[in-house]
Regions:
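An alpha-helical, amphipathic repeat domain used for nucleic-acid recognition
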Residues: 1-171
């Protein structure tokens, strides 16, 4: 057990904890406030681990929100990106929370991405399925999105030909 001897704000707006005169860790102010600890509090390794886990989960959630504000991700894609900075467990919990909030929806992502691949790149259903699977969409969802998008194969073929041979489009 250690005794917290000092609590100070860092230049970056975090709360630095010192136990027995030595720096222990820094926390987000909200995580610190929720912990209920103060100078003179007795703290053990388990309590430090809990604080560290809570801080990491907060960081994972903040990173997830920041990433999702810039672009859409699949659940797997977001989890993969988050694990570069936080533990698998924290990344998984953050992804679950984003799904609960409706910020990640693999079916919605698949439908939108399939539409884009069809219209912009003129991909066929098989290639759309392949691209969706590569991004972490399950095979059933990928197949459903690809089949929705290729409802007129003849129009798709004409669009590809017009793009490849624009001079012949008038004939």
């Amino acid at each position: 057990r250690m005794t917290l001897t000092k609590i100070a704000m860092t230049k970056r707006g975090r709360v630095a904890l010192y136990a027995d005169g030595a720096f222990v860790m820094s926390l987000h102010p909200d995580v610190f406030a929720a912990s209920g600890i103060s100078v003179g509090s007795q703290i053990d390794e388990d309590a430090l681990r809990e604080l560290s886990d809570a801080a990491e989960l907060r960081e994972a959630r903040e990173r997830a929100l920041s990433m999702l504000s810039r672009q859409d991700y699949t659940a797997r894609g977001l989890r993969d990106r988050l694990t570069r900075h936080v533990s698998e467990e924290a990344a998984g919990q953050a992804v679950e929370r984003m799904q609960e909030l409706g910020l990640i929806d693999d079916e919605r992502y698949a439908a939108r991405f399939a539409q884009e691949l069809l219209e912009r790149r003129h991909y066929g259903a098989a290639r759309i399925r392949q691209e969706l699977r590569r991004r972490g969409i399950d095979s059933q969802t990928a197949a459903a999105a690809a089949s929705l998008e290729e409802n007129d194969p003849q129009a798709h073929i004409l669009a590809v030909l017009e793009k490849k041979y624009p001079q012949a489009a008038g004939d």
